[in-house]
């Protein structure tokens, strides 16, 4: 299958969803050589992957992932990475805040790729056991409204792709597959992207993958997040319909920040930023978390406007709920480690 797929893509022909899923299955099963994998990834990059190709590849990744118990009405807050902005962990902090409102969040993430601190790095620095089994993570989702699914633990088949990606050294379809391959199969998703041209295609991909409500966002300062330093371009998926619009921080009563205000550092430094936000510190770091948490709450609860989501996130922080919930989460993680030990 992979030989025929390479030939088609080299000739600038598009693969169907089914063809892409089948050829990725070959790669994920270790049945393709590194040369074949590199050839396919290079040809897809040169052609530009279609919606069907991205969705088919994501479906294959999901099917080869470590199984996660079936969940309903679960939210994901995630970015593609690759914006080279070195911000603190905005989406991870936002996920902690959103979970404290009673909304279930299954956060799928990895260690840092283009930054100093990925979701796994900062959560580990906060004291969470990032290597929890699916059963334990599912239990955490039910008890604490928050679970972390460590990509390295769930996507073992990526071992057949990782060396090729490293040697190629340029962006491939896999740079956008991570946020689409959450084993919890989220029904609602706030997805940040590093390139504005990805907004509409990835909104359509999410639709194909069964996501019912989503916002795909790109900060025009380059962030793969809702930004407070510039406008944010949005494509929203709701009821099978896509809507394009832009937002500014000012329209939600938030001050415009400088990009320098949002820069983070090591996992330990970013963990301290998260702790300060959860403890009630005000300023640009809190504001960008409020914006992203508010958008995520709108995605999870469409009857709630972004502004109402921001207000709820602010009240939740001021009531110390995220701080208390994070303490419960860490206590739960420690308890489960003791049980396993």
Swiss-Prot record:
Binding annotation for 5-phospho-alpha-D-ribose 1-diphosphate: 79, 82-83, 87, 89-92, 107-115, 119
Binding annotation for Mg(2+) 1: 91, 225
Protein residues bound to Mg(2+) 2: 224-225
Residues holding anthranilate 1: 79, 110
Keywords assigned: Amino-acid biosynthesis, Aromatic amino acid biosynthesis, Glycosyltransferase, Magnesium, Metal-binding, Transferase, Tryptophan biosynthesis
Entry cofactors: Mg(2+)
An example Gene Ontology biological process: L-tryptophan biosynthetic process
Any single GO CC term annotated in Swiss-Prot or TrEMBL for this entry: cytosol
Assigned EC number: 2.4.2.18
Reaction(s) catalysed by this chain's protein: N-(5-phospho-beta-D-ribosyl)anthranilate + diphosphate = 5-phospho-alpha-D-ribose 1-diphosphate + anthranilate
SUPFAM superfamilies in alphabetical order: Nucleoside phosphorylase/phosphoribosyltransferase catalytic domain, Nucleoside phosphorylase/phosphoribosyltransferase N-terminal domain
Residues annotated to bind anthranilate 2: 165
UniProt cofactor note: Binds 2 magnesium ions per monomer.
Gene Ontology molecular function terms on file: anthranilate phosphoribosyltransferase activity; magnesium ion binding
Pfam families listed in its UniProt record: Glycos_trans_3N (PF02885), Glycos_transf_3 (PF00591)
Family, per entry: Belongs to the anthranilate phosphoribosyltransferase family.
Biological role stated in the UniProt entry: Catalyzes the transfer of the phosphoribosyl group of 5-phosphorylribose-1-pyrophosphate (PRPP) to anthranilate to yield N-(5'-phosphoribosyl)-anthranilate (PRA).
Protein name according to UniProt: Anthranilate phosphoribosyltransferase
Species of provenance: Lacticaseibacillus casei (Lactobacillus casei)
Biological classification of the source: Bacteria, Bacillati, Bacillota, Bacilli, Lactobacillales
């Amino acid at each position: 299958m992979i030989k025929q797929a390479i030939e088609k893509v080299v000739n600038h022909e598009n693969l169907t969803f089914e063809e892409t899923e089948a050829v990725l299955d070959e790669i994920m099963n270790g049945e393709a050589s590194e040369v074949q994998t590199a050839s396919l990834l290079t040809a897809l990059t040169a052609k530009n992957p279609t919606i069907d190709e991205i969705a088919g590849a994501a479906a294959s990744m999901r099917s080869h992932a470590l199984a996660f118990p079936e969940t309903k009405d679960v939210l994901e807050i995630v970015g593609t990475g690759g914006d080279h902005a070195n911000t603190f962990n905005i989406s991870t902090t936002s996920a902690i805040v959103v979970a404290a409102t009673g909304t279930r969040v299954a956060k799928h993430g990895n260690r840092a790729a283009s930054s100093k601190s990925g979701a796994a790095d900062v959560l580990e620095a906060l004291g969470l056991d990032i290597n929890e089994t699916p059963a334990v993570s599912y239990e955490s989702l039910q008890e604490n409204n928050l679970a972390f699914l460590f990509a390295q633990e769930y996507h073992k088949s990526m071992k057949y792709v990782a060396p090729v990606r490293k040697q190629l050294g340029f962006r491939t379809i896999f740079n956008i597959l991570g946020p689409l391959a959450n084993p919890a199969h989220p029904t609602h998703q706030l997805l940040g992207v590093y390139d504005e041209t990805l907004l509409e295609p990835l909104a359509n991909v999410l639709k194909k993958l069964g996501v019912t409500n989503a916002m795909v966002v790109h900060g025009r300062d380059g962030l793969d997040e809702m930004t407070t330093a510039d406008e944010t371009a949005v494509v929203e998926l709701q009821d099978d319909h896509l809507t394009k619009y832009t937002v500014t921080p000012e329209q939600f009563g938030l001050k415009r920040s400088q990009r320098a205000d949002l820069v983070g550092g090591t996992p330990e430094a970013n963990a301290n930023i998260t702790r300060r936000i959860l403890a009630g510190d005000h300023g640009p770091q809190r504001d960008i978390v409020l914006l992203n948490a508010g958008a995520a709450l709108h995605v999870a609860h469409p009857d709630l406007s972004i502004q109402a989501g921001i207000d709820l996130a602010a009240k939740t922080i001021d009531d110390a709920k995220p701080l208390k919930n994070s303490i419960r989460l860490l206590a739960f993680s420690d308890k489960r480690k003791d049980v396993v030990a």
